[in-house]
Amino acid sequence: MNIKIAGAISTGLIIVLAVVLVMPPFLSYQFTPQHVLLLFTIDSKKDTSSWCTQLSQVLEKHDATAAIFLSGSTAEQHPDCITSFSDEIDIGSQGYTGNSIPLIPDYSDQLEEVKKGKQVIDEIGNFDSKLFKSPYGDTDQNIYSLLEKSGILADFSYDTQYNKFHNGQFIWFTIESYDANSFSIDDIPTKSSERINPIIINFENNIAIDEIDDLLSDVKKQRVTFVSASDLVGFELNSMEGL
């Protein structure tokens, strides 16, 4: 075989091999899934228990994880809003009454509000719930002290960040939050370079189950990965250890 031809063939094989080796990570980068957390805030209504049961079925249908938040009082009235969901769904508290915590004037009463809400959730769910979302998103300078003293390690009270307890303090991580009523699939970035922060879609239990079902069907078409709150913070938020 002509030396020049052999050399050209060898060079071509090397180039092809290099392309084969480089393409998988390149394609992986190009098609990075967008992380999406479905966050449901549940208030006490006449049909709340039925709504929760139907929601659990929709989440299972779409193989979707999520985070559910409710007050201790709502949980007592509608325990199905805890027991209906699989272990893949994180359950968090919103105090006991569901009222704005900063409006409680005394610190010890604020602490009792947070602790009692968590206690009810824990007893019904038979787990140690470590996540919290302040009612109405209302917080003040006491929030992290209250959470730490209550054994809560993750906070989803804000629209632009979530906070987790690490090395003796709460640290924040950026998120992008959307109201389910106004959310559009156009809000999901199409480029991997833009898929930097997790997206949280906020639902309340005044949204029809059929609408949630339809929205999840549309979202799944956009190369997303549904994540739980535990996935985001990197540790289990509904632990059964020690119970």
Predicted regions and their residues:
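N-terminal pre-catalytic segment of deacetylase/amide-hydrolase enzymes
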Residues: M1-F40, T48-S50, V224-L243
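A general structural signal for short secondary-structure junctions and capping/turn motifs
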Residues: N2, N163-K164, T190-S192
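Solvent-exposed loop and beta-edge segments used for protein-protein assembly and interaction
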Residues: T32, E60, S193-R195
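Metal-dependent polysaccharide deacetylase catalytic core of the NodB/CE4 family, i.e.
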Residues: L37, H62-S145, K149, L153, ...
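A generic secondary-structure signal
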Residues: V58, V120-I124, T190-K191, D218
